[in-house]
UniProtKB/Swiss-Prot annotation:
Keywords: Acyltransferase, Cytoplasm, Lipid A biosynthesis, Lipid biosynthesis, Lipid metabolism, Repeat, Transferase. The keyword Cytoplasm applies. It comes from Helicobacter pylori (strain J99 / ATCC 700824). GO terms for cellular component: cytoplasm; membrane. This is Acyl-[acyl-carrier-protein]--UDP-N-acetylglucosamine O-acyltransferase. Involved in the biosynthesis of lipid A, a phosphorylated glycolipid that anchors the lipopolysaccharide to the outer membrane of the cell. Its EC number is 2.3.1.129.
Amino acid sequence: MSKIAKTAIISPKAEIGKGVEIGEFCVIGDGVKLDEGVKLHNNVTLQGHTFIGKNTEIFPFAVLGTQPQDLKYKGEYSELMVGEDNLIREFCMINPGTEGGIKKTLIGDKNLLMAYVHVAHDCVIGSHCILANGVTLAGHIEIGDYVNIGGLTAIHQFVRIAKGCMIAGKSALGKDVPPYCTVEGNRAFIRGLNRHRMRQLLESKDIDFIHALYKRLFRPIPSLRESAKLELEEHANNPFVKEICSFILESSRGVAYKSSEYSSEEKQEE
């Protein structure tokens, strides 16, 4: 049975699932759909064509689904899709997509978005990610699974962050980050590998292989792109080579790599 506060303002066109809790002074618009077990604390605003998945919990003063902050937006149909078991903390803002992107913003399952996180239009966030307080994502950003982003970090539009990466706090990131890397700084560059996450997700032999692969890729000569092409030719059937090298070759913004900033020393990768 759903539990809905008397002061909540809910459109009759909204769809409310079983066991949903809606706190005091929440505002729920026409196109909103709440799956079963969703919990909204007080003063949450949900607008637009917004879907919230099972057991997601949204805290006070979060605003989801209002018009994208994009001057090109002209009122076209767009969506915000949030998966299951997410925690969205106070004052988060998440905008739907636009005609200039994929027409939707997508958030996977089991993510934690801490207070004051901003997710702009057409972003895609995977599952099991943590975005710490004050993280700001511009439009069209893609974030893979198991990514951690430190507080007060800003990320440029169209940047891609692959699976298992760690972005240090107070960073300004303007280029793509391939799988399992750590980046830090303003501007942020790759500093090493995220071995903590790798140990959680991979076997030891695979970690060693990826470490050796990055050492070869990040040699001064040949270029990073040429090295990626060579690795794909030599190890075409290896899934890690495919994942990492294809990501590098598909990058339109370039990779956040500078030889003077990267260290392969074990002590800097922990």
